[in-house]
Amino acid sequence: MTGGFCVPVLLAAWLAAAAAEGLEQAALPAEESRVQPMTASNWTLVMEGEWMLKFYAPWCPSCQQTDSEWETFAKNGETLQISVGKVDVIQEPGLSGRFFVTTLPAFFHAKDGIFRRYRGPGIYEDLQNYILEKKWQSVEPLTGWKSPASLTMSGMAGLFSISGKIWHLHNYFTVTLGIPAWCSYVFFVIATLVFGLFMGLILVVISECFCVPLPRASSERCEQEQSTGEAQGAEQLQDAEEEKDDSNEEENKDSLVDDEEEKEDIGDEDEGEEDEEEDNLAGIMAEERSDTNERAVVKEGSVSPKEDGAHPADTQDVVEDALRQRKSQNANKGS
């Protein structure tokens, strides 16, 4: 009887103790996370000191698996002398565009404004060795236009921020208001067209304000001056061509006259040469005749009449042949 009474008493005492312990644990405050959330307003903190950043999304299973490891890594941040942060790409699409995050989870190391992509697993031991052994020094940094602090990535952040706002607005239409998705798409198409027309109108107004049109009279004068200038230019070109033609004709005429004069000079020279040759031949014939006469006087009676008349005849034939050859040569030169 006593044993049966003790069992319920012990059970009641154990339940009371468990309830009291649960109340004490509930009364204790939750342990504060050492991971610092990063937003578009405070992300510049990573430009100073050494940081490790994690980009995640609440719906990403891989991101959820590394949450506990990331918290452990953040708790030991003081020992490692490093700050640990995280970025929710759903709430901060601009930062995901600034770091050009395309896969989740994504990890980045920052040292005095120089960023590097960490591509290892999100396990505490690997993260700790990455910092202690300074493995980040062997990783190529994001420099130039790839750097999150560059002007290019600032523009990319603006584009991602606008796309995030459009996505939130689409969810508001389809989830909160219950509007069909195709109605939301039609709304965005119309809004895009209206925005384009509005921007075009603004550009036209700006051009009209800053680019003052010329008066009509001045524009007509400019056109007349331009037409007269073109006509004068055409006339000058025509005159120049005519002058060239005239000069070419005069040159041709002068060249023809010079050729004719040269031909006449050549003919006169040939005639003079022929006269000189004829005179020379006549002198030769006279000398030969005188020689024959002298020989005839010396050798009177010793030479027969046939021999006496044969020698002058032979010399005369030779002279005539020479004259004929000379004339034929001159005729060939003239032709």
UniProtKB/Swiss-Prot annotation:
Main location: nucleus
Signal peptide residue numbers: 1-20
Skewed-composition ranges (Acidic residues): 238-280
Entry GO CC: endoplasmic reticulum; endoplasmic reticulum membrane; nuclear inner membrane
Transmembrane segments: 186-206
Subcellular location: Nucleus inner membrane; Endoplasmic reticulum membrane
Keyword Cell membrane appears in the UniProt entry: no
Record bears the keyword Transmembrane: yes
SUPFAM superfamilies found in the cross-reference section: Thioredoxin-like
All residue ranges annotated as the Thioredoxin domain in the record: 26-133
Disulfide bonds: C60-C63
Start and end residues of each stretch annotated as Disordered: 222-316
PANTHER family: DUMPY: SHORTER THAN WILD-TYPE (PTHR46107), THIOREDOXIN-RELATED TRANSMEMBRANE PROTEIN 4 (PTHR46107:SF1)
UniProt-recorded name of the protein: Thioredoxin-related transmembrane protein 4
Organism of provenance: Mus musculus
